Amino acid sequence: MAQQTPLYEQHTLCGARMVDFHGWMMPLHYGSQLDEHHAVRTDAGMFDVSHMTIVDLRGSRTREFLRYLLANDVAKLTKTGKALYSGMLNASGGVIDDLIVYYFTEDFFRLVVNSATREKDLSWITQHAEPYAIDITVRDDLSLIAVQGPNAQAKAATLFTEEQRKAVEGMKPFFGVQAGDLFIATTGYTGEAGYEIAMPNEKAADFWRALVESGVKPCGLGARDTLRLEAGMNLYGQEMDEGVSPLAANMGWTIAWEPADRDFIGREALEVQREKGTEQLVGLVMTEKGVLRNELPVRFTDAQGNQLEGVITSGTFSPTLGYSIALARVPAGIGETAIVQIRNREMPVKVTKPVFVRNGKAVA
């Protein structure tokens, strides 16, 4: 039996088409995925992301533990509320999950991890936390709503108290603050400005309704996927998993190699991979008719004349750009063009950086 978030009833009242998403009943769309996508790019949309797992870590050695657990380095976190994106790797350098970590105090950090990987994440964290005497609290008492788009912050702020408005005033991206009963973070998964807001479960339905009344459009998983793909953001299980190195998933920037004496899980394997070279994640653009889909083969000839093949990890029609885009994992050596096999047709594609839209504007 699939679980329901505290907002399930609100979704049905808003006319959602509900689907089972990794054991959670979640809205796919509320009538038009396209309208929802455009609302986020041009105005404000919101997503129920309460299926994500919030984990609070407390203890005097929490920072030391996270410096070992994560490939990125929480030593960078010195300002209260600052957030960091990181991979959590296994010993062979594969990605167990990608997550966000927030710093509150020396003995209090917060993780937000994916829903699909919840059980293995919690097991892995618990196993490795034991020697550090960390107190782990899974915050199933909290709901999480993402409000995204150019007008999202202004519309969400109409629901805030004076204290909450002051707390978020001038807050830069990738920060979070606890203000009253809301935890408000300037994070998201769309390439737009906005907030991800955690609140007690019993407050979620009223907050959702108030957002609807303030002109924020409910959005489902369909729009969430096209938005994150336009923004070049990875989806766990597609761009990376336990068999894929972060170096092959455009996550090299999230690996803190310095200081060289910091030991983190997967470091040794990553150093070998960095030395040998890995596949890479690239963007693909196809302006001709057709749609680039997951798992389609990508073929190209490198500078030495070798014929090589990669694979599309995520592909879709981009509502913002009006043509097809994809992320693809390919061998090193790809040039500016490639061929994608769509049924019996060989379609030419342009190879780009793995990001297509930022703040509503084309970058590919």
UniProtKB/Swiss-Prot annotation:
A GO term, aspect molecular function: aminomethyltransferase activity
Keyword Transferase appears in the UniProt entry: yes
Domain of life: Bacteria
Reaction catalyzed: N(6)-[(R)-S(8)-aminomethyldihydrolipoyl]-L-lysyl-[protein] + (6S)-5,6,7,8-tetrahydrofolate = N(6)-[(R)-dihydrolipoyl]-L-lysyl-[protein] + (6R)-5,10-methylene-5,6,7,8-tetrahydrofolate + NH4(+)
EC number(s) from the headed UniProt entry: 2.1.2.10
Keyword Transferase: yes
GO CC field: cytosol; glycine cleavage complex
Enzyme type, top EC level: transferase
Family assignment from sequence similarity: Belongs to the GcvT family.
Function: The glycine cleavage system catalyzes the degradation of glycine.
GO biological process, one term: glycine decarboxylation via glycine cleavage system
Alphabetically ordered keywords of this record: Aminotransferase, Transferase
Source organism (scientific name): Citrobacter koseri (strain ATCC BAA-895 / CDC 4225-83 / SGSC4696)
Pfam families: GCV_T (PF01571), GCV_T_C (PF08669)
SUPFAM superfamilies attached to this UniProt entry: Aminomethyltransferase beta-barrel domain, Folate-binding domain
Assembly: The glycine cleavage system is composed of four proteins: P, T, L and H.
Protein name listed in UniProt: Aminomethyltransferase
Organism phylogeny: Bacteria, Pseudomonadati, Pseudomonadota, Gammaproteobacteria, Enterobacterales
